[in-house]
Amino acid sequence: MLLLFFLNFLYFSHAVFIDKYRDYKDYKYYELTGSREGLENLKKFMLNVDESLIHSESLNKSEIILSPHLVSLFREAVKKENLKVKILHDDISEIIRLEKGNTRRRIKKFSWNSYYDVNDIHQFILNTTKVNPEWTELIVAGQSYEGRKILGLRINTPYENGQRETGKPVFFIESGIHAREWIAPATTTYFINQLLTSRDPDIRRLRDQFDWRIFPTVNPDGYHYSYNVDRYWRKTRSLSSNGCRGADPNRNWDYNWGQHSASSRPCDYQLYAGSKPFSEIETRTLSKYISSIDNLLFYVAFHSYASLLLLPYSDSVEHVDNYDDLVQIGQRSIEYGSRVNGEKYDGPGTAAETLYKASGGSMDWVRYALKTPLVYTYELRGSSFHWPPEKIPEQGDEVVQMMLGLADGAKELGYY
């Protein structure tokens, strides 16, 4: 019995206690510019050399984090493809070390000058429901592969008799689907706090107009792993038949699955789309919860980083039937956000036109399968995945205003 307990303990604690912390000592961080074809050729070549290659891309720029032993090979490939290369960080471990110095557990009070592990984010959600029982309701959309709850928060104006107000349009926010994009859950919890504590009449109006369903970390296993073991981990933590871990949960939804910017190789560090649509329990259970919502008007996903506002569809340049409305409402959102710090997002436009083609994402599935009228993805600001923790409120205030812009724009066009 004791042996069985020990084996179970090892299995369920694998991510934290067996995997060695990856410090990325002497890893180089490069920015590449050039032709789209050249950038794509370089990426394919380097991925054939190293499936764990860390890369981020847009239409005419790529960024790569590279092991020191691959630098010579990389420079030869860059020369062959006639690309321009710029080194952003000579040793990325220093950035991670400084960031980790600002991550700490605060038991008494959750704040927005540090990044928190998923357990602390969940505790924030639980505490919020306890402090605001008349306004909030805990949502458990399901469980992750490793058994963590997929926790969300419902915020809705109560009637005077204490009953929830029904019939309002639903505003759904999804965040943290990609584990390494820490600023997304941080700004989402900041937004929750502002909805419930701000005395600004515009923010109170925003709160009262909708039935809110907000999920700060829809990939809790991946986020926990990124926080504790591998900073650049992006996927879930499911186990494939060949022993490799995880699938990209934003390539795993059942809309044109596996067609663009998706890998069929389970050991692909970033883009493995899973063995089939909704193979991941996180996407499967979340999709069931979303499907159960009546009167869903807005679906918003937060990612990082690019300062972009994206529209469906991600794998096609064809426009949805209310594309012009989406653009007009999105422009209002960008305008409102720019008032905070003078920073302006690019877009709005389809992901296929403004970023790159990608299939199997949540935004596209929600639009196609559920016919949700107003669907957006925000690629938050920054020049890397390392947004300074002391500047979380800066992004948070922009997000608050951008959500207000969406609401005002939609109301002006008669969506509610």
Feature names for model-found ranges:
Residues 2, 11-416:
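M14 metallocarboxypeptidase catalytic domain recognition
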